[in-house]
């Protein structure tokens, strides 16, 4: 099932309309358009129908990382190591990251949000999760991070949402679930964060990682068709 996410800003007062299209096949659409500052719903269809959340998961991943970095005083220049097991995730990996590569949190965020990079998402979750892990009762870094994603969802009133990983790829036994209405709540929260706004508004970015002390540079282009 294909999932698409659209955000656009219009008018002099920067009124943001957030539209979510989930399941583009006939008869299976779900969408909602919301004025982000007033909360007024402009239109909706099947907005409470639960659907696989797929790559929209990365919005929650980004916000948990940004909130954690702010609360912990962690610099986004801090270096993370790509964890073991990421080669099994599948899907987008535009930088060709492999376990052991080193990348800053900032560069990983760019690759995740602009290039829908699943390995970058897992790397961010692993790095932040190791800090969160100390108060999570023995969970793995990824599991501790996903717990925070679901805590964020509950805090935003996303009652029909369940995240199962940091990247949105379906697992063999589970998949993340949400609704257009719930994702609107998350997107409004994200777009009110200046850091998140800055990342997603970039059209192209040259980013770097390190492998065996050799710098590897890439241009990551925004996969959002409206940018």
Describe the residue ranges of each PLM region:
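Bacterial N-terminal signal peptides that target proteins for export
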Residues: 2-14
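Domain-terminus/edge residues, biased toward the C-terminal soluble/receptor-binding domains
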Residues: 162, 174-182, 187-227
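Active-site-adjacent loops and short helices of periplasmic peptidoglycan-processing enzymes
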Residues: 22-181, 191
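Non-catalytic cell-wall polysaccharide-engagement segments
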Residues: 2, 148, 152, 223
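Intrinsically disordered, low-complexity regions enriched in small/polar residues
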Residues: 7, 22, 33, 39, ...
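Bacterial N-terminal signal peptides
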Residues: 12-22
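Alpha-helical structural motif
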Residues: 13-14, 145, 192, 219
């Amino acid at each position: 099932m294909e999932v698409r996410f659209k955000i656009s800003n219009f008018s002099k007062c920067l009124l943001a309309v957030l539209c979510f299209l989930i399941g583009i096949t006939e008869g299976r659409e779900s969408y909602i358009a919301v004025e982000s500052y007033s909360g007024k719903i402009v239109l909706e269809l099947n907005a409470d129908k639960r659907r696989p959340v797929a790559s929209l998961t990365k919005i929650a991943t980004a916000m948990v990382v940004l909130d954690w970095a702010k609360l912990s005083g962690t610099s986004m220049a801090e270096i993370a190591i790509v964890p073991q097991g990421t080669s099994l995730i599948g899907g987008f990996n535009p930088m060709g990251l492999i376990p052991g590569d080193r990348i800053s949190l900032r560069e990983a965020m760019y690759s995740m949000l602009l290039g829908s990079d699943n390995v970058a998402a897992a790397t961010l979750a692993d790095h932040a999760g190791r800090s969160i892990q100390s108060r999570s009762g023995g969970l793995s870094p990824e599991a501790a991070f996903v717990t925070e994603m679901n805590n964020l969802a509950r805090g935003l009133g996303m009652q029909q949402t369940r995240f199962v990983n940091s990247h949105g790829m379906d697992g063999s036994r589970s998949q993340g679930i949400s609704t257009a209405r719930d994702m609107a709540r998350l997107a409004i929260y994200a777009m009110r964060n200046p850091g998140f706004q800055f990342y997603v508004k970039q059209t192209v970015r040259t980013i770097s990682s390190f492998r065996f002390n050799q710098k590897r540079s890439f241009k990551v282009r925004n996969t959002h068709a409206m940018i």
